[in-house]
């Protein structure tokens, strides 16, 4: 099985909260697709709660689009990582890390303005696979954590995993 790019970076030295360009691809028609690692938690030291990450998934996807989409950027998808330490964001365009960090920070401020769980978008049996598994309180706690710590930038060259550690 091929080694995925996300496993070629050293998770023991990753900063969080932090933005990292995980991959840039060019389509056959010439469009750039950028995948960002939006790391909310320090790997193996912090973790997002299942209910909190689910609520963030519903809120973060919309708020990031409000703050980042424009003439040269369109978000395709924002999905939680299986390890529950962050999200991957795929988009058309090549915004820089600081633009993404600014949009992320603004989105966390927006999360804090949501005061009633009943106003979370798509939180119903028809549009959500586990609509009862949400926590606005946990999402607020995560948003406050990101705002208080600020958002750093992780560079791939600083995180390159030593080849001796690959496929242990």
Swiss-Prot record:
Class of enzymatic activity (EC top level): lyase
Bound cofactor: record note: Binds 1 Fe cation per subunit.
Identification of the protein by name: S-ribosylhomocysteine lyase
Binding site for Fe cation: 54, 58, 128
A GO biological process held by the record: quorum sensing
The organism of origin for this protein: Mannheimia succiniciproducens (strain KCTC 0769BP / MBEL55E)
A Gene Ontology molecular function term of the record: S-ribosylhomocysteine lyase activity
Protein encoded by which gene: luxS
Reaction equation(s) it catalyzes: S-(5-deoxy-D-ribos-5-yl)-L-homocysteine = (S)-4,5-dihydroxypentane-2,3-dione + L-homocysteine
């Amino acid at each position: 099985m091929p080694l995925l790019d996300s496993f070629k970076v050293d998770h023991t030295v990753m900063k969080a909260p932090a933005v990292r360009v995980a991959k840039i691809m060019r389509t056959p028609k010439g469009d750039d697709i950028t995948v960002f690692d939006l790391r909310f938690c320090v790997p193996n030291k912090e973790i997002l709660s299942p209910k909190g990450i689910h609520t963030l998934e519903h809120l973060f996807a919309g708020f990031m689009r409000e703050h980042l989409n424009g003439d040269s950027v369109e978000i395709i998808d924002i999905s939680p990582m299986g390890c529950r330490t962050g999200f991957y964001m795929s988009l058309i365009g090549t915004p820089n890390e600081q633009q993404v960090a600014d949009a992320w920070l603004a989105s966390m401020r927006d999360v804090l303005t949501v005061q009633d769980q009943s106003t979370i978008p798509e939180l119903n049996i028809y549009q959500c696979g586990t609509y009862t598994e949400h926590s606005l309180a946990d999402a607020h706690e995560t948003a406050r954590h990101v705002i208080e710590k600020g958002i750093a930038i992780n560079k791939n060259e600083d995180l390159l995993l030593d080849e001796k550690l690959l496929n242990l």
